[in-house]
Structures are given as C-alpha cells and as structure tokens.
Amino acid sequence: MFGLFDFIDEWIRALFTDSIVSNYTKMFAHVNDEVGNIAAQVGATPFDYNSEIYNMIRALSETVIIPIAGMILTFVLCYELIQMILEKNNMAEFDIANIYKWMMKTFIAVYVLTHTFDITMAVFDVAQSVVNASAGIISGSLDADVDLADLADYLDSLTVGELFGLWLESNILGLAMRAISLCIFLIIHGRMIEIYLTISVAPIPFSTIVNREWGSIGNSYLKSLFALGFQGFLIMVCVAIYAVLIRTSMGGDIQTSLWSAAGLSLLLLMTLFKSGSLCKAIFNSN
C-alpha cells in the first residue's frame, strides 16, 4: 500500500519536475530567440526588411508625391525670387549675381528632389552600418544558457506542494513572457512601418529644404530620418544590456531566476518604448 503511495508521489514529482524543466528551458530559449530576432530586424534597411513593400512605397512616392512636391518647389522658388526682387528696392539696387545664386539654388533643389530616395536610403545605410558594427561587438553577449543539472538537483529537494507552486509560477510567467514578446514584436515591426510611412512622403519636405523660411520643414524631416535610423542602435544597446542582466540573474534559485527574467523582459519592453522618444530628443526632432 505504502509502495503505491510512493509510486504516485514519485510519478507526480516526475511530472512536475519535467514540466518545470521544460518551461524553464523554453523560457530562456525564447529569450535567446527574441534577442536574436530583435538584433536581426533592427539591422535591416527598408529595402532589406521587405523589398516588395519598399518598391510599392517608392512607386507611390514617385508617381503621387513627387508631382505635388514639384508644385511646392515651384511655389517656394518663385516666392523666393519675388522676395529677392522686392527687398532690393524693386530691382533699383538689384545685383545680377543674385540671379545666378537663385539659379544655382534651383538646380540644387531640383537635384535633391529627383534624388530624394537615394538621399533617404543613404541615411538608413549609415544607420545600418552603425548597427551592424555594434552587433559585431555585442553579439557574444546575447546568449543565456540554462544549467539543467543544477536545476534538476534543486527540484529534487522540493516537496510536491512546492513543486506544484513552482509549476504554476512557471506557467503564469511563461504566458506573461509571451505577452511581453508580442509587445516587443509590435514595437520592432511598428518602427519599420513608421519608417515606410515617413519615406513615402519624403519628396514634400525635401522640396522646401533650400528655402530660408520653409527650410525648417526639410531640416526637421532629416532629423526625424536620422532619429528613426539610429533608434536601431539604441535598441541594440537595450538588447545587449538585457541579455547581460538575464545571464547574471540566473545565479540564484529557480524562482528568483523566473521572476527576474519576467521583470527584465518587462524592463526591456519599457526601454524599447522609450528608445524612439530618446532618439528624437538626441537629434532634436519633433
């Protein structure tokens, strides 16, 4: 009779132990996968991320937005020419050299407008090179390993009630980690959608960049491009810090490790949310 109880006890203990080990292993494997996916996504240019979306955005910009930008550029240049004439006492003191300056400015403005996507992609190419260079330095810090031998020894020392509580905790935290991962997924991919939306209207702010009064629109737009591009670098730094903290938090017991992993994942989510506003503040972008 007592042998039957012992058998049931061992069976329950083995069931909980295997489930806890599986949850624990999956959780940290999920952490490694999530970190690797983030590092891969933020290092992609708009073309590398999805060439089909990029080509669609470029086609829309060139066929729909550039004609509007051309009208804006014409208005801006005509307005500047009229202003140039009037401020010189209705051409009574007008210097013919100003016409050549205006023609040069017009040439530069038209060149910038017709090469909008080349300039825009150059910004993200620079940002990508920075992200890739940083990835080469911190990639070795992105793995969190699980010592299954120590974990099994620790679980063997627990009672059935303690194992049940730990099993319940591991399942709850596993669900929480998946919810946090979904939010992180939305942030990373939402950034790329924001980039596509931003570059789709690039010709309009670029059409104002050579004008003294309207140039602030183009300058602010360039700042926002650099902010979006270099946000990837800040995300890489956040991920590297997160991975190091995850690895160093695994020295205690399993409960501490589980809650630390969940708390640090929530912290990563918060820092990723802040990375966009921080980068805009650095580049003074509105």
Language-model regions: role of each:
Residues 1-72, 88-97, 107-176, 215-220, ...:
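Gly/Ser-rich, low-complexity
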Residues 66-79, 195:
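Hydrophobic alpha-helical transmembrane segments
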Residues 74-81, 172, 199-203:
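Transmembrane alpha-helical segments of multi-pass small-molecule transport proteins
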Residues 77, 115, 119, 185, ...:
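Helical mechanochemical/support elements of P-loop NTPase systems and associated helical scaffolds
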Residues 81, 178, 203-207, 240, ...:
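Alpha-helical transmembrane segments of multipass membrane proteins
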Residues 81-94, 181-185, 213-214:
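Membrane-water interface regions at transmembrane-helix termini and the short interhelical loops
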Residues 102-105:
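Elongated alpha-helical scaffolds
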Residues 181-188, 192-195, 199-238:
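Extended serine/threonine-enriched, polar tracts that run as long, contiguous segments within proteins
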